[in-house]
């Protein structure tokens, strides 16, 4: 879906596809973290990125249409548009996970607490004017050493910086997305905002049966959905059918895990007073499986032998690390 208001401006197809890849991957990461930590601020960032993906998708389609005049040129861009559409689908599914938090869908707190033990923390903090971070580079700050946290993305007004490096200089008003261990969050937050970090008080009753099984499934679904996205982009970079088949296998496994998690919810519903506390888990299962489906849509361009335009390879190579399959 395109934004209601937009203004077309010429964009490079390679840059657009690179940005769509980076944005969709970040959204998946943030969406799961928002759900696990019940963090509305991070969930809102996911929806902001979803709006951005709509705009990128619009510009991608416009640029593709304007760059073709002949049938053979249009055929060459079919793969580009398929990859872009799949990236948009990944973003939409990540947005659905974020809405679990914003719409207060039911995921029991004891399940979230158990999930936190298996995941690193993601925190959002805005750089204040008086912050020691303002005006300094990430290399100077050495946040990974000082706090045990590292910045994975920065929102600067409406622009995003993905995978910032040591030379990236922070500014007042930058919204930092950082990953690390729970112990480092208070110091990182205070360094950025100059305010004391106040963790949320958590109260919950232990009512869930076979909780460990649900945690295992959700952690596996999260890891497999993220892996399938990374593998899918690697498959098209190397035009590698072996990697593409791995994505297909992950997609089939995700289908089974979705049904298994749904079955767990139905069984657990017998033992809870309010079944609404489990509603979000069903939503999570469907959204996670949708991410895997979309990743398969990317890999399918290789399996169907759709001609891969050089734009795709350049876009993926311009992004982050890639994955190869070892025999």
What are these regions (language model features)?
Residues 1-327:
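Cytosolic, long alpha-helical scaffolding segments
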């Amino acid at each position: 879906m395109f934004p209601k208001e937009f203004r077309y401006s010429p964009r490079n197809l390679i840059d657009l596809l690179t940005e769509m890849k980076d944005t969709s991957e970040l959204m998946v990461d943030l969406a799961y973290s928002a759900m696990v930590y019940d963090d509305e601020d991070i969930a809102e960032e996911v929806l902001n990125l979803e709006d951005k993906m709509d705009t990128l998708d619009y510009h991608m389609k416009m640029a593709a249409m304007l760059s073709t005049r002949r049938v053979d040129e249009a055929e060459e861009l079919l793969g580009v548009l398929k990859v872009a559409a799949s990236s948009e689908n990944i973003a939409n599914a990540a947005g659905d996970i974020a809405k679990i938090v914003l719409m207060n869908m039911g995921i029991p707190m004891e399940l979230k607490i158990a999930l936190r033990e298996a995941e690193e923390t993601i925190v959002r903090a805005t750089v204040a004017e008086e912050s020691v971070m303002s005006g300094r580079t990430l290399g100077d700050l050495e946040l990974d050493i000082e706090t045990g946290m590292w910045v994975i993305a920065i929102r600067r007004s409406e622009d995003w910086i993905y995978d910032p490096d040591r030379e990236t200089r922070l500014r007042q008003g930058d919204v930092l997305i950082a990953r690390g261990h729970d112990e480092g969050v208070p110091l990182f937050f205070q360094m950025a905002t100059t305010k004391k970090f106040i963790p949320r008080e958590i109260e919950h009753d232990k009512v869930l049966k076979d909780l460990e099984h649900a945690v295992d499934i959700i952690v596996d679904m999260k890891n497999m959905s993220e892996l399938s996205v990374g593998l899918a982009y690697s498959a098209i970079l190397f035009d590698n059918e072996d990697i593409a088949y791995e994505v297909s296998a992950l997609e089939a496994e995700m289908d089974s895990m979705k049904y298994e998690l749904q079955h767990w919810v139905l069984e657990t519903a017998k033992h809870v007073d309010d079944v609404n506390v489990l509603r979000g888990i069903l939503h999570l299962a469907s959204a996670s499986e949708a991410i895997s489906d979309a990743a398969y849509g990317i890999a399918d361009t290789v399996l169907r032998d759709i001609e891969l335009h050089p734009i795709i390879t350049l876009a993926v190579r311009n992004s982050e690390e890639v994955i190869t399959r070892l025999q």
